[in-house]
UniProtKB/Swiss-Prot annotation:
It is found in: Cytoplasm. It holds the Pfam family NTP_transf_3. Mg(2+) binds at residues 102, 221. It comes from Nitratiruptor sp. (strain SB155-2). In the N-terminal section; belongs to the N-acetylglucosamine-1-phosphate uridyltransferase family. Residues 1-223 are annotated as: Pyrophosphorylase. The lineage of its organism: Bacteria, Pseudomonadati, Campylobacterota, Epsilonproteobacteria, Nautiliales. GO terms for biological process: cell morphogenesis; cell wall organization; lipid A biosynthetic process; peptidoglycan biosynthetic process; regulation of cell shape; UDP-N-acetylglucosamine biosynthetic process. NCBIfam families: glmU (TIGR01173), PRK14359.1 (NF010939). Residues 245-430 are annotated as: N-acetyltransferase. PANTHER family: BIFUNCTIONAL PROTEIN GLMU, NUCLEOTIDYL TRANSFERASE. Its cofactor is Mg(2+). One of its GO terms (molecular function) is UDP-N-acetylglucosamine diphosphorylase activity. This is Bifunctional protein GlmU.
Length: 430
């Protein structure tokens, strides 16, 4: 049977204490809503997102990343709350899976289990060791009898450890029957989706529980929750890649975003940070190095190196305290203390310590092109735009301001002046 997915993302998220919409806060490089839609698309091609607070900002982001997502603006003035969120939706399929926009850890393989259960309502349940503060889900004979808030529970009900995880599968006819009957007769004056449980039970509908893992169904309501969710996702990402053969030294100190990919045999040392759409192929990333939106192939990076976006590094050694930005390096050695930005450097070239590509004049960025088998001496400044042909030797301390032809030596130094006995005269010593 086909089914629809509805994602509730209309909430204000005041506990996040941020001007950014809650569902756009990132986990492992992507907003929470991205993770949820990505998993939902694995099980359904009919996805609707319910919006209200900062709706246009959220909608704009989703439309940029995904095709075919429908949007409904909640009538929050007249129908606030989770029950009000579903009032104006046309359901095209016979089953509707309702997800929350602040549950980025949910996985498609778990959601598929909802569909396999034959019931009018499938209610997600978490078994908690300490359910204090949560309403309890009372189950008898494999059926949900009712949900009771902690303040209303008796001693027997308080002993129950089952709590509502907040994800539901409804049959279409049930929603059409009971959504109009919801009332806002409560302290918050909101329409609650959970009230449908009691209405359905009164009319003899079947309500089945599905026990789900807590670490997938934890909501993110604060920056603390956000940090905890990222820890869980980091563990998933690193576990996956280690199972694929990536070596990670002290993996708890390594940070890998969700779009990072590995090929071949790779090793990451402690403190490595990999961000964005980065590809690491048959390479060794040494301690405390950062790679962002770049490709590293058959290379050694670090320790303490920074590879900034749009860099392509192949068969190269990038050493400690070297920064590379928007550059292509093929067969290059840059051992230490250099900045290589907007540069193309070919094989066999050695970059000495303290080399700087001066790529910005205050108004625009310019290219530095270095050919094959070039030796760049320490403390060299390359004033872009500039082109260095093959087989060039650049002496230490040189400032290169014009193109250098093949096979040449480039040197620019102030002559060394030695003043004898100056130390003694300056300090007044004999």
């Amino acid at each position: 049977m086909s089914f629809s997915v509805v994602i509730l993302a209309a909430g204000q998220g005041t506990r996040m204490k941020s001007s950014l919409p809650k569902v756009l806060h990132t986990i492992c490089g992507r907003p929470m809503i991205w993770h949820i839609i990505k998993e939902a698309q694995k099980i359904s091609d009919d996805i609707t997102v319910i919006l209200y607070h900062q709706a246009e900002i959220i909608k704009e982001y989703i439309q940029k990343e995904f095709d075919g997502i429908r949007f409904v603006l909640q009538d929050h003035k007249n129908y606030p709350g989770t029950g009000g969120a579903l009032r104006n939706i046309y359901f095209s399929n016979e089953k509707i899976l309702v997800l929350n926009g602040d549950m980025p850890l949910i996985q498609a393989k778990t959601l598929k289990n909802f569909i396999s259960i034959d019931a009018d309502i499938v209610l997600s349940v978490i078994r908690m060791e300490d359910p204090c503060g949560y309403g309890r889900v009372i189950i008898k004979n494999d059926e949900v009898e009712y949900i009771v808030e902690q303040k209303d529970a008796n001693e027997e009900e308080l002993a129950v450890c089952n709590v509502n995880a907040g994800v539901y599968l409804f049959k279409k006819n049930l929603l059409e029957q009971f959504l109009p009957k919801l009332t806002n007769d409560n302290a918050q004056k909101e329409y609650y989706l959970t009230d449908i449980i009691a209405l359905a039970k009164q009319h003899g509908f079947s309500i089945k529980p599905i026990f789900v893992p807590k670490n997938e169904f934890q909501g993110v309501n604060s920056k603390y929750d956000l940090a905890n969710a990222e820890i869980v996702m980091q563990d998933r990402i690193k576990r996956h890649w280690m199972q694929q053969g990536v070596i990670m030294r002290l993996p708890q100190t390594i940070y890998i975003e969700v779009d990072v990919q590995f090929q071949g045999e790779c090793e990451l040392e402690n403190g490595v940070v990999l961000r964005g759409k980065t590809l690491i192929e048959n390479s060794h990333i040494k301690a405390h190095s950062v790679v962002e939106n770049s490709t590293i192939r058959y290379s050694t990076i670090g320790p303490f190196a920074r590879i900034r976006p749009q860099s392509m590094i192949q068969e190269s050694h990038i050493g400690n305290f070297v920064e590379v930005k928007k550059s292509s390096l093929n067969g290059v050695k840059a051992g230490h203390l250099s900045y290589l930005g907007d540069a193309t450097i070919d094989e066999g070239t050695n970059i000495g310590a303290g080399t700087i590509t001066c790529n910005y004049d205050g108004k625009a960025k310019y290219q530095t092109i270095i050919g094959k088998n070039v030796f760049v001496g320490s403390d060299t400044q390359l004033i872009a735009p500039v082109k260095i042909e093959d087989d060039v030797l650049i002496a230490a301390g040189t400032t290169v301001t014009k193109d250098i032809p093949k096979g040449a030596l480039a040197i620019s130094r102030t002559p060394l002046k030695i003043v004898k006995d100056f130390y003694y005269k300056f300090f007044g010593k004999n």
